[in-house]
Amino acid sequence: ANADRFEELAAEVTQSMLTYDSAWQFPATLLTVALLPAVCEEFAFRGVIQPLVAKWTNNIHAAVWMAAFLFSAIHLQFHGFLPRMVLGAGLGYLVIYSNSLWPAIAAHFFNNAGAIFMAAIYGPEWVAQEMNAAPEWAASDYGIAAVSLFVGIYLVRWVRKTGTWPKHHPVH
């Protein structure tokens, strides 16, 4: 019952953030819903929590999945818990393989920005439908995930091509 109430509140907040009354609200939303969370959450979860757990457990996989679990839990949207946790793990491994937070920040930004653009294109009804469609993924979720995956793969390849991979990494 409490989880459902959190979902309802999250839907209301999300819908209000993604409904625009003036032109300046769209760039403000990109800043507050896409850029700031991407930077702050990646620094917190992949920059602080993940390395701490790796140090405590001496297991990078445990660190990635623990940070991903906490990343998903902190959003308090339980119907989308598993997809968000998998996204968090993907971002965690992106940090490990690139040896940088920036590809994960970029992928996180594009994931969030994709949802903002979809809301701007399809309107508040789309937001309400998407928020109430949980736990199944809608077609747009797959689209956003595919774009995010493409951007993530591109960034990893770019980082690898520029030679910034750590020498001790098993890819070498």
Question: What label would you give each PLM region?
Answer:
Residues 28-53, 150-162:
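Transmembrane alpha-helical segments in integral membrane proteins
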Residues 32-33, 75-76, 136, 140-142:
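Short alpha-helical transmembrane interface motifs in multi-pass membrane proteins
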Residues 27-31, 61-66, 81-82, 105-106, ...:
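Hydrophobic alpha-helical transmembrane segments
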Residues 33-39, 69-77:
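Transmembrane alpha-helix interface/packing and boundary motifs in multi-pass membrane proteins
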Residues 109-172:
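C-terminal membrane module of polytopic membrane proteins
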Residues 72-76, 80-134:
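Functionally important transmembrane alpha-helices
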Residues 1-36, 167-172:
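Juxtamembrane helix-loop-helix connectors linking adjacent transmembrane helices
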Residues 40-66, 93-100:
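Membrane-interface helix/loop boundary segments of multi-pass membrane proteins
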